[in-house]
Each structure stands twice: as C-alpha cells, then as structure tokens.
C-alpha cells in the first residue's frame, strides 16, 4: 500500500483526496493541517473571517464533491443560516454568501471523504493543529517533520497543498497589519485614521472588518444598505488607497459553464506559440481583437478597438472609470449589474474577456522577458479586473460607508513611498504626504519563489538546481533535481503564479488536486512549460 502525505487540508487538499478515492486503489494517506479543524481552509475559516466577509464564488461555480454547495445549504437548519443573515427561501445557485459558511461546507465534505476512504479500505490519519515544519527527500522516501511528537515515517509521495501564504501575525503591530489575515480579525481598531492599501475585495473586506467595530449595517427590503455609526466613533475615517483609485465592478450575469471561444482556440494559440516567442504577444492580441469584435462589434467600435494594441488596450478599458468619481461609477455599475441579473442579460464584451483570460494564460510561459512585462502591465490587469468582479452586497456596504462619510478613495499614482513607523504609517507621493494611525496592506497574494519555501530541507534541495521557480510536471510533481523527481507534488498556489498568473479560485484547486492525484499511479509524461526568467 503506497503511503501518501497531504500537507494542507484546505480546498486543494480536499480535492486531491477526492480524486485519490476515485482511483479505487487503497492507499495509506496522512493529512496534516496546521489549523484546529482540517477541511476548512484559511480563506473560509472563522478565525480569519467575520460573518460580513463574502466568498467571491457562487454554488454554480464550485466543483461539487458529494453535493453542490446549494444542495448542502438547503439541508441546513433555518436558524443556523439566519446566524449569517441568510434566508433559506431566498437561496439560489448564483448567490454570494459568507466565507465561513463555505468553510462549513468544505469541512462537512472533508469528513465524509475521510469516512468513505476508510470504507474503501484506505488507511487514513488526520493530524489537526499539526504544522509541517520541514520536508526532505531521502533514498528511503519523503520525510516530514512536524510540531507534534509523531512517529517517524517516510512517504512515497508528498502533496503540498498549503494554499495562500500570508505574513505571520508576529509581523503585525497595533498600528500595522501586513495583510488582513495577519491578526486583523482579533484586533481592536480604535476610531482613528485608517489606511488600507488595495481596492479589491480584500481591501473592502478589511474596511468592513474595521467598520463593524464602530457601528452596524442595516439593510431594508429593497436591498438598500445604511451604516449607523456608534456615537463614540466619530473620529473613524477609512481611506482605500491604490495606484489608480479605481474600484472593481460588481459581479455580472453570464452563462455558466462558459461558452466556447470562436477564434482564440487552443489550436490557434498553439499555432502562434509554435511560431516562436518573438512577436507572440502581439500576434495573440490580434486574435483577441477578432474574438472581441465577433462577440460585441458595437463595443469594439465604441472603444476604437482596431486602433488599439497590447499596450493601449488597458488604457481604453479603464478610461471611462478613471474619468468618473469611483463611488458614482460603483453606484451606476451596481444598478446596471442588478438589472442585468433580473433580466438574465449578458453583456457580450464583459463575458468574452472573462472567457479569454484562462485561454490566453497558456501563452505566458512562452513569452520573452520584454513581452512578459508588457503583458503584466496591460492585458493581465484587464483580465484580473474582469474576473475579480465583486459581490453586489460588498458594493452596497461600501456605498453605505460613503453615505456615512466614513470611507474615501485615494489614487497614489505610480510613484510613491511608504514608511512604516512604530506609531503610524506614512505614504509620500511627489506632491503630498498621507499619515495613518492604523494601516492594513490588502494587496493580495504575491508570487513566491524557491527561497520562500517554508520547509528548509526541501528549499535547500531545490536551491541546488539554481532555479528560482520550482520546476513541476503536468501533475505538479517536482522535476528537478533528478533525485526528487516525481516524489513531491507541489500544488501550492503562490509558487505557481509566475507562469499561471490567473491561477486562483476553487475550480483551479479542483483541477490541481485531480492532477496531483494522478501522480500516485502514473509519472508525469512532460514538464510544464515555465518562465525562463524572473
């Protein structure tokens, strides 16, 4: 019986276990989870989130395990759902709900998987509150070290499914939080001048986490939200900061599963890749232009799409939003999106960009360094803005804070400096200086390199190759050095973002988990293409 270690029991680890059970061959599986409860995952745990924080994914998009998320919700007691402000009679498969509820779903599915595994004669051990502190490959197998006094054993395959990586809480102070997941949920933030770097959903969630310490959101039957500030919190002022000062749009209605693309097909992209890296980005952009024109000729004409190139397309995409007050734009966009949802109307240009991002991602490892930078500054920002559209409820709460005179948005521009001091954080632009009593960095996950791997033994072994990015096969097993090949499946998202910049979400977790499970029975037939620079 092969011995498998799964490090991390969040969504990627859960989908890996799910896929292993489909193979029917009994295995010995040890699951290591540093949190108190395996099967929840950091993004959905009650330790890292408040009831206010919404998951940016609906049931219709979540790969089901035993049942869909919606089916699971419909089986819950009314009183339990009401604790999260959810009414059973209003549930539907496109609804955005509190992250903690989604964590409960995954916990339930995980426990059922463990039971099923044992019924299928798998040997399963689950270690909770158990942090893997080191991982090393020896001739005998993969050895793990943990913070618990566990018997020494070796594994045939170790699956690294550790998910997002945020700064330790030890790096946070009373006045500075390096991420919203570095102690902010437990912290008492006084009514003061609060700065939040980032205007994505993470930034908005951080603002909500602060705001609910100083008042409450009230929603009427017409979905209008107001914020009632506590009398003792008059000094609360929240500023969202970013280079552009642009807010994300509200999540829009579209057909799911996605309709196929007509021009930017796998065949067309592979043909361009085969022509070589020189000019690849510009050639693919011409395909993108044709795809957008096919989907929405009117919008294409309105933005003069034919006159745009890789570098100017992003400017055209954001132009109208930059000219408007961000809150006015958000209110207008919210009204449009909600109308489209009621009418089940799809905006063609938004939908085609959404479908393009995963297809176009395939060219990223094949770009030369110059074009990779152009892609990151242009098209990538458009794609991210489009797929990271946020729940309407988050926009309503943001607008409620604005009506209450609490929240503001500041565009810093491209050139600014940040000074983190003991009592405050100061940001300086060419023209101004901004000081904050409390500062929260909510810019999201950054790509990580070999030097950032938290397991000293594995890190040292990989550093001998001289590669800055882990070299993984199509099943995500490490390919270099030779003595490691096929023995560690490296599915930790932050280390995959260099050549998969849009790898995120539960669909990606399921796909990676399925691929890593294949490593148990069949070695990778080929390595993934990866960046030759970074």
UniProtKB/Swiss-Prot annotation:
Alphabetical list of Gene3D superfamilies matching this protein: FAD/NAD(P)-binding domain (3.50.50.60)
UniProt cross-references to InterPro entries, sorted A to Z: FAD/NAD-bd_sf, HpyO/CreE_NAD-binding, L-asp_N-monooxygenase_NS-form
Gene this chain is encoded by: ydhS
SUPFAM superfamilies noted in UniProt: FAD/NAD(P)-binding domain
Listed name of the protein: Uncharacterized protein YdhS
Pfam family, one: NAD_binding_9
PANTHER family according to UniProt: BLR0577 PROTEIN (PTHR40254:SF1)
Native organism taxonomy: Bacteria, Pseudomonadati, Pseudomonadota, Gammaproteobacteria, Enterobacterales
């Amino acid at each position: 019986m092969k011995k498998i270690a799964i490090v991390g029991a969040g969504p990627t680890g859960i989908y890996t276990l799910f896929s292993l059970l489909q193979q029917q061959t009994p295995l010995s599986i040890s699951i290591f989870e540093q949190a108190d409860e395996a099967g929840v995952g950091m993004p959905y745990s009650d330790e890292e989130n408040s009831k206010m924080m919404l998951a940016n994914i609906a049931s219709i998009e979540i790969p089901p395990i035993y049942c869909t998320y919606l089916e699971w919700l419909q089986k819950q007691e009314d009183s339990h759902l009401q604790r999260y402000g959810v009414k059973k009679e209003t549930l539907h498969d496109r609804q955005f709900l509190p992250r903690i509820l989604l964590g409960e779903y995954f916990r339930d599915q995980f426990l059922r998987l463990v039971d099923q595994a044992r019924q299928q004669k798998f040997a399963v051990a689950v270690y909770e509150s158990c942090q893997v502190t080191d991982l090393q490959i020896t001739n005998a197998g993969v050895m793990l070290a943990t913070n618990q006094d566990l018997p020494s054993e070796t594994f045939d395959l170790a699956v690294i499914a550790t998910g997002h990586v945020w700064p330790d809480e030890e790096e946070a102070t009373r006045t500075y939080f390096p991420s919203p997941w570095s102690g902010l949920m437990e912290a008492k933030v006084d009514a003061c001048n609060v700065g939040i770097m980032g205007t994505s959903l993470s930034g908005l969630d951080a603002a909500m986490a602060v705001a609910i310490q100083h008042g409450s959101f009230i929603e009427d039957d017409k979905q209008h939200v107001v914020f009632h500030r506590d009398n003792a919190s008059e000094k609360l002022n929240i500023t969202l900061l970013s280079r552009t000062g642009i807010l994300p749009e509200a999540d829009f209605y579209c057909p799911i599963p996605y309709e196929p693309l007509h021009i930017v097909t796998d065949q067309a992209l592979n043909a361009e890749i085969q022509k070589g890296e020189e000019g690849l980005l510009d050639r693919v952009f011409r395909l993108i232009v044709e795809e957008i024109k096919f989907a929405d000729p009117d919008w294409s004409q309105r933005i003069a799409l034919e006159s745009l190139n890789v570098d100017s397309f992003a400017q055209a995409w954001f132009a109208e939003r930059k000219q408007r007050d961000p809150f006015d734009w958000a209110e207008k966009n919210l009204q449009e999106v909600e109308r489209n949802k009621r009418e089940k109307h799809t905006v063609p240009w938004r939908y085609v960009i959404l479908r393009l991002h995963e297809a176009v991602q395939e060219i990223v490892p094949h770009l030369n360094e110059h074009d990779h930078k152009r892609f990151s500054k242009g098209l990538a920002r458009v794609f991210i803005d489009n797929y990271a559209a946020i729940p309407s409820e988050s926009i309503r709460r943001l607008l409620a804070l604005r009506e209450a005179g609490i929240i503001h948005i500041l565009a810093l521009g491209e050139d600014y400096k940040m000074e983190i001091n003991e009592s405050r954080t100061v940001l300086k632009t060419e023209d101004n200086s901004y000081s904050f009593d409390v500062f929260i960095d909510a810019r999201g996950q950054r790509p990580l390199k070999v030097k950032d791997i938290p397991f000293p033994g594995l890190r040292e072994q990989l550093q001998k190759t001289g590669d800055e990015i882990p070299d993984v096969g199509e099943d995500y097993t490490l390919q270099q050095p030779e003595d490691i090949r096929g023995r560690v499946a490296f599915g930790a998202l932050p280390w995959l973002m260099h050549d998969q910049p849009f790898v995120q979400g539960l669909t990606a977790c399921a796909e990676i988990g399925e691929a890593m499970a294949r490593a148990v029975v069949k070695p990778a037939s080929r390595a993934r293409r990866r960046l030759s620079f970074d």
